[in-house]
Amino acid sequence: MMLTRTVTAVALLVTTAVPALRADGNAPGFARGADVSWITQMESEGRKFYTPGDDRQEMECMQLLRDHCGVNSIRLRVWVNPKDGWNNIDDVVLKARRAENLGLRTMIDFHFSDTWADPGHQEMPEAWKNLSLDELTTAVGNHVTETLNALKNVGVTPEWVQVGNETTPGMMLPVGSVDNPGQLTRLNNAGYDAVKSVFPEAKVIVHLDGGNHQWAYDRMFDILENNGGKYDMIGMSIYPYWAEQQGETGGWTKVADDCIANINHLRQKYHKPVMVCEIGMPYDQGELCKQLITKMMGAEVEGIFYWEPQAPNGYNDGYNLGCFDNDAPTVALDAFKTK
């Protein structure tokens, strides 16, 4: 998730045969996910969660999402040295162990920052700012290895690991900018190799924002392909709200159609599966959000993760794209319920 978007324009088209790489949206293998990284912070503030309907029952959030919303996977972000401790390694391990105990699958999302990393913010961790490229590459690998070993030690085996979050302009700027393709690829590969050293079967994801912006995906994945970049899966974010804020017209259906066209293009060009790592709409548009998720579940994707669904309207200085109202789920995630 992010607060700003940047717009550039590049377009490349290549079409080739593509293998079958997806699970059906209603099949058990399809990831019906939620990023709940705020959950421990919210609990520390005394927030509670309730089952939908008139007979409200208090329930732990991950169990609520599993039992009442059809969620089978959890996504958790990792920050390097956050000032308040949330999203550090210990916090991530705590949440991941809870998910594991509920039988939920796990995605780990490395931001490689002390705070939010997104298209408008790809800030180097403070402790890494004066490192050489060689030292930075080592730091990336060590951070990934330390985090994943901590998870392994408590019995958590992530199914997917993101090397960077919404890295449309690159990561750990300016060193890992898309304007420095060799350096960006080297940092990416350091993360990839570290993941595989701990969890060889984990799928490594490179994740960009704006799933309807084909040019950005062509730029990033051409960089990786041309420089020996390693990745197993393409990740995208889908937020019609942000598209509208940028002046794009056509509403959520246009965004969804453009995302689906891009998904088909990416699978054909790069022969990689695609995951919707983030999706969301305003909390008071639950029915429209349900339609968006349902439409995207019919696309050639491996799964869909709603970003912080449990967040109340206005949480954390104004986030309004959750899908809970009065601390209970809206109908948005009904799309995840298996038929």
Question: What kind of feature is each model-predicted range?
Answer:
Residues N26-R105, H111-V140, E146, Q162, ...:
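N-terminal substrate-binding region of glycoside hydrolase catalytic domains
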Residues F30-V36, N72-L76, T106-F110, E159-V163, ...:
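Hydrophobic faces of well-ordered beta-strands that scaffold small-molecule active sites
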